[in-house]
Every structure is written in structure tokens, then in C-alpha cells.
Amino acid sequence: MTSLPEPTAINEIDADALRADPARWTQAAQPWVARSLVDDWPLVSAANESDSAFLDYLLGFYSGNQVSAFLGEADIGGRFFYNEALDGFNFLQVQTTLNNLSEQLRTLATDGSPPSLYMGSTNLDHWLPGLSGANPLPIDLTQPLASLWLGNHSLIAPHFDFPSNIACCVAGRRRFLLFTPDQVTNLYV
């Protein structure tokens, strides 16, 4: 087991600097934050208006295909993980429509102790065709894979994403805990 290094601050870069020289940052193999990178997206404008406007905007692109969603009881506190016996999970995976998921999220928003509900990495081209075109990433990338996470409060266990990621938080809040690549052997039991 490799010991963890001391946490360090993430480079915060200006969105204009990223737009001017994207290769410098996307090929740096170092995490960074560009907070205002997608502020001009219509999706962000809808989210700034209200959660309901955000969901309505997404539904305007929805293909109608079933999506996978994950549902955990309120007592998991949003932490999707193994069950206490470690022989299964503390959540259910369900197939549903984005319309139904959106309605559930609207309802749960007023619940003081809601169950946790989220739709994991969902490919935009298949489930929300046209959304990427209407909200283009303002830097040139070769064939980016664009996907959406959507849900209420959730805590996802550390995991390894093979592709490099540019995560754009367009509604609500999102926090990432990043580990150095040499820690991948410590992520899984």
C-alpha cells in the first residue's frame, strides 16, 4: 500500500487562458479548475433560473430512450456503496424515463430527508441528441465523449475513470476528490 501524499490545491486557471491555449492544459496531466468556462451555455442559464427550468431544458432534447438510475434510501445519506454485509449494494438500479426521473427529482427537492436518486454518466448523443451542439465546449477537443450526471445529493466512492475528464458543473454543486495516479491500486478491495 502506497501512502497518500499531502493534499495540495488544484490549479485554478482563467477560462480565457484555457480557450487561448487548450493543449497546454488538456495535455498537462494535472488537474485544474476553470470556473467560468461554460457560463454562457443556455443550459447554465436555465439552471440559474431554477431547477425546474433546468430540467425542462434537458427534456427538450430527450430522445425517449430508457435511462439507468440509482436509488438509495434516505438513511444512506447519499452514499452509494456496498450494503452492511458487503454482499450486495445499498441501492437499487432501475430503468426509467428521463421524464419520470425529472418528476421524481422535482418532488424530492421539497422533502426534508429525501432518498438519494441519480442518473450516472449518460451519453448525450444517444439520450439527449443536440444538447452538446446547443452547449458546445468552448475549447477544441478531438472527439470528446460528452455525458451527463443528474441527481440530488449523492456521494460516489472513489473510482478510476480511464479517459481524461473535463467536468462542467452546470447546476447545483459538485465536489471532486482527486487522487494521484499511483493511488489506483488503493481504490479497490
How would you name each of these model-derived features?
Residues 1-189:
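N-terminal accessory scaffold of Fe(II)-dependent oxygenases
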